[in-house]
Amino acid sequence: MDLIPQQLKAVTLTHVRYRPGDQLGHFLAWISLVPVFISLGGFVSHFLFRRELQGIFFGIGLVISQFINEFIKTSVEQARPETCTLLEACDSHGWPSSHSQFMFFFATYFSLMGCKGIGFWFGLRSRWIMNLLHWSLAVVTMYSRVYLGYHTVAQVFAGAALGGIVGASWFWVVNSVLYPFFPVIEESVLGRWLYVKDTSHIPDVLKFEYDNARAARKDMDSAKSD
C-alpha cells in the first residue's frame, strides 16, 4: 500500500519567495530576513562576546514577543492574503505579522535604550543616526511583507503596533522591576560562571573599556620588561 505524502510545512520566519526577475522583490526578500540576522548574528554574538545583562534581557524580550505573536495568531486564526497559495504559506496564520512585530519591538526597545543612555552611544548625532537606521529597517521590513504577498496592510500594522507596545512594556519591566536584581544576578553562581555583567551605569562604556584595555596592556608590558 502506497503512502500518501503529507503536505510539508515551512518555517515562516525564513520562508521567503519572490517573483522571478523582480529585483525589488529580491531585495525585499533579503530585508524580510533581517529579524533572522538580528537574532542569530546580533544576539548570539552579543552573548558570546559581551555577556551584558541589558542585551540578554533584550533578547529574552524578543523571544517573549514571538511567543505572544504565536499565541495571538493561533487564537485569532486570520488567514493570509490570497497570494499565500502561490507562496505556499497558507498553512500559517497572518494576523499579526511576526516580522513587523519583531522589528518594531527591536526599534522601540533600542530607541528607549538610547534615551536612557544605555549601550554604545557616541553622542546625540550618532544616536539619531542609529535610531533612523533601525526605524527605517522596521518600516521597510513591514512594507516587504505586504509587497511580497505574505500579509495584508492591516496585518503588518497590527504587528507593528503590538511590537511597539510589547517592546515599551518589556523595557519598563527590565529597567524598573528587574534592574535592582542585576547585582544579584552578577554575583550568583551562574552569573559568575558565565561572566555576565551590567555596564549600563557607566556613562561612556566604550571609552571606559578602551581606557582599561590600554591600561591592562601597559601593565602587562611593564611586567614582561621587569
Curated annotation (Swiss-Prot):
Inhibited by Mg(2+). It comes from the Eukaryota. It is an enzyme of class 3 (hydrolase). This is Lipid phosphate phosphatase gamma. Optimum pH is 6.0-8.0. The chain crosses the membrane at residues 24-44, 52-72, 102-122, 128-148, 152-174. Expressed in root tips, root branch points, vascular tissue of cotyledons and leaves, pistil, anthers and filaments. InterPro entries: Dolichyldiphosphatase_PAP2, P_Acid_Pase_2/haloperoxi_sf, P_Acid_Pase_2/haloperoxidase. Exhibits phosphatidate phosphatase (PAP) activity in vitro. May play a primary role as PAP in plastids. Belongs to the PA-phosphatase related phosphoesterase family. One of its GO terms (biological process) is pollen tube development. It is a multi-pass membrane protein. Disruption phenotype: Lethal effect when homozygous, due to defect in pollen germination and pollen tube growth. Keywords: Acetylation, Chloroplast, Hydrolase, Membrane, Plastid, Plastid inner membrane, Transmembrane, Transmembrane helix. It is found in: Plastid, Chloroplast inner membrane. GO terms for cellular component: chloroplast; chloroplast inner membrane. Its EC number is 3.1.3.-.
